[in-house]
């Protein structure tokens, strides 16, 4: 097992990474749990892992109840959030009841937002079961639900008490979900660590077959990079925005196609290539870097191009992006592979040229 600590102005918390951790969850998480916990999961994850977690909590002497939600990005909304609140209140959850998010990014984001707002703040713990959530969304305290006009538009910064990433849960992940998670892994190398990017180019076949040593190293490195960035910029006033590489274009794809049609990681993959193309238009990164990024994404079974839709629709979706400031769109681009940069765009003709092959 590998561990690291996330340090933020609000508080510090551990991340546990390894195999076979879920049966040990009671003992590992006991210092971060109250006397009672609410396990919140979905219909897909519950049959696989809920029983193991319940047994682990029983062994640690932690009482618990469970709330099982519908699965999928399409359910990341007010209606499902209210199902969480219904379950908490029906079970008389108190402010000190620990909410445990058992699932992927959708569960983690919603449970975190529920924790941030239930009785003005309850503790919560992340137990991510997908690659995407283990390397990205479970760490750093971003919580949210979607709105029909934009992804993750309603939420809060609210840090967990701990994160437990059991890599064994990835063995039940569909191949498409594994690829989607790998988009976020590749993103880290592209935005801030060329050495890691080159390592991914060498080890992608082993990663896609979930070989234990390289997988542990990849998840650890991603969490380490995110922890370092979050420690410097908890509420995304500066460099934390780098973590949104590919997300402005990607969120537009998700919103246009309908949440869940393209998986988040698939949209981010195409978005990363578009961000590199935009950087080319601005005279920053090279066409060779863009091609190299696209090739690595394709090696992970990911799309390197977005679906085709009208430029006006792209603009409409991107105008709702959370990075828009003073009406000016802000994109995360690349100076070169391994070096992200925040770019303000006032000339939409540059965006049109970037997107022209997909209009």
From Swiss-Prot:
Catalyzes the conversion of 3-deoxy-D-arabino-heptulosonate 7-phosphate (DAHP) to dehydroquinate (DHQ). GO terms for biological process: amino acid biosynthetic process; aromatic amino acid family biosynthetic process; chorismate biosynthetic process. Keywords: Amino-acid biosynthesis, Aromatic amino acid biosynthesis, Cobalt, Cytoplasm, Lyase, Metal-binding, NAD, Nucleotide-binding, Zinc. It is found in: Cytoplasm. Pathway: Metabolic intermediate biosynthesis; chorismate biosynthesis; chorismate from D-erythrose 4-phosphate and phosphoenolpyruvate: step 2/7. Its main location: cytoplasm. InterPro entries: Dehydroquinate_synthase, DHQ_synth_AroB, DHQ_synth_fam, DHQS/DOIS_N, DHQS_C. Its EC number is 4.2.3.4. Binds 1 divalent metal cation per subunit. Can use either Co(2+) or Zn(2+). The gene is aroB. It catalyses: 7-phospho-2-dehydro-3-deoxy-D-arabino-heptonate = 3-dehydroquinate + phosphate. Its cofactor is NAD(+); Co(2+); Zn(2+). NAD(+) binds at residues 71-76, 105-109, 129-130, 142, 151, 169-172. GO terms for molecular function: 3-dehydroquinate synthase activity; metal ion binding; nucleotide binding. It holds the Pfam family DHQ_synthase. It comes from Neisseria gonorrhoeae. This is 3-dehydroquinate synthase. It is an enzyme of class 4 (lyase). Zn(2+) binds at residues 184, 247, 264. It comes from the Bacteria. GO terms for cellular component: cytoplasm.
């Amino acid at each position: 097992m590998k561990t690291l600590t996330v340090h933020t102005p609000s508080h510090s918390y551990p991340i546990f990474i390894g195999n076979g951790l879920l049966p040990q969850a009671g003992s590992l998480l006991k210092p971060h749990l109250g006397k009672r916990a609410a396990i919140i999961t979905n219909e897909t994850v519950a049959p696989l892992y809920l029983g193991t977690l319940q047994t682990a909590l029983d062994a640690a002497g932690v009482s618990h109840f469970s709330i099982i939600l519908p699965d999928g990005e399409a359910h990341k909304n007010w209606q499902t959030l209210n199902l969480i609140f219904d379950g908490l209140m029906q079970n008389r959850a108190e402010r000190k009841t620990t909410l445990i998010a058992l699932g992927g990014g959708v569960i983690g984001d919603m449970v975190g937002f529920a924790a941030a707002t239930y009785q003005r703040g309850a503790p919560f713990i992340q137990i991510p079961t997908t690659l995407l959530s283990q390397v990205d969304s479970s760490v750093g305290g971003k919580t949210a639900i979607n709105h029909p006009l934009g992804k993750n538009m309603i939420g809060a910064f609210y840090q967990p008490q701990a994160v437990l990433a059991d890599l064994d849960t990835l063995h039940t992940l569909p191949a498409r979900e594994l690829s989607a998670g790998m988009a976020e892994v590749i993103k880290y190398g592209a935005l801030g660590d060329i050495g890691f990017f080159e390592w991914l180019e060498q080890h992608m076949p082993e990663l896609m077959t979930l070989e234990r040593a390289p997988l542990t190293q990849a998840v650890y490195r991603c969490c380490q990079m995110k922890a370092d960035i979050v420690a410097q910029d908890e509420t995304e006033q500066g460099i934390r925005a780098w973590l949104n590489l590919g997300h402005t274009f990607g969120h537009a794809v998700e919103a246009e196609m309908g949440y869940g049609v393209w998986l988040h990681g698939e949209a981010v993959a195409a978005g990363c290539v578009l961000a590199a193309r935009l950087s080319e238009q601005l005279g920053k990164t090279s066409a060779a870097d863009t091609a190299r990024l696209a090739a690595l994404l394709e090696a992970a079974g990911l799309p390197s191009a977005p679906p085709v839709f009208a430029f006006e629709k792209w603009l409409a979706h991107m105008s709702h992006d959370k990075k828009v400031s003073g009406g000016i769109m802000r994109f995360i681009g690349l100076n070169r592979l391994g070096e992200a940069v925040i770019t303000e765009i006032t000339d939409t003709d540059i965006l049109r040229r970037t997107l022209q092959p997909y209009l």
